[in-house]
Amino acid sequence: DFALDKTTEESIRSIGKSNELNHLSADRIWMELRTALSSPRSANFFSSLVSLGLTDPWFSKISSFDLDESNSPRLKWIELELQNNFSLHESLELPKEFIELTNLSFQLAAIDIEEDQENLIDKLEKINFHRNQKEVEEIIKLKFFENKRDYLIKLKDNILSKDFSILGEAPKEDMMKMKKDLYIESIKESK
């Protein structure tokens, strides 16, 4: 840890007040963000942005940055999004993999254990556990999912244990009902 001298701190604060940051490209901001997320002390970067008044325009919605520093840069980003109501990516141009992971984490966060089956099935289809199994397993390890982690693990395991390949052989008119039945069975087994 180190401390800025007063003159340096004042100079940095004046940059934030001058709107100079508005003229930086989203790509440049992403490069700095990627470096910060790769750091073993990523939270210090965000803490400094806030304390030095450098959040506008790129991080104006950041309010929390309690990160598990042992996580990968991708998972640190997801932690930030989860803690800040998925509002950070709106002003940034993120790589596709970060956008997809953000969307997947948003879908997982939206799952409610007490939700009615129809809504839950819609959400489960969007998550696509078969295609996104590895990413789902990474995301649900995050502290944010502590209260529903067991349920999500059961749900994932029960869905993955079903043989959805039978849908390819089913008559088109029966396919949707059969798929829905597989999801309903998985949901019931997970409660």
Positions of the model-derived regions?
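C-terminal subdomains that position terminal phosphate/3'-OH groups for nucleotidyl transfer/ligation
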Residues: 44, 48-191
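Non-catalytic nucleic-acid-binding/docking modules located in mid-to-C-terminal regions
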Residues: 41
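Active-site pocket-lining segments that scaffold enzyme catalytic pockets across diverse folds
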Residues: 30
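Internal alpha/beta core interface subdomains
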Residues: 1-21
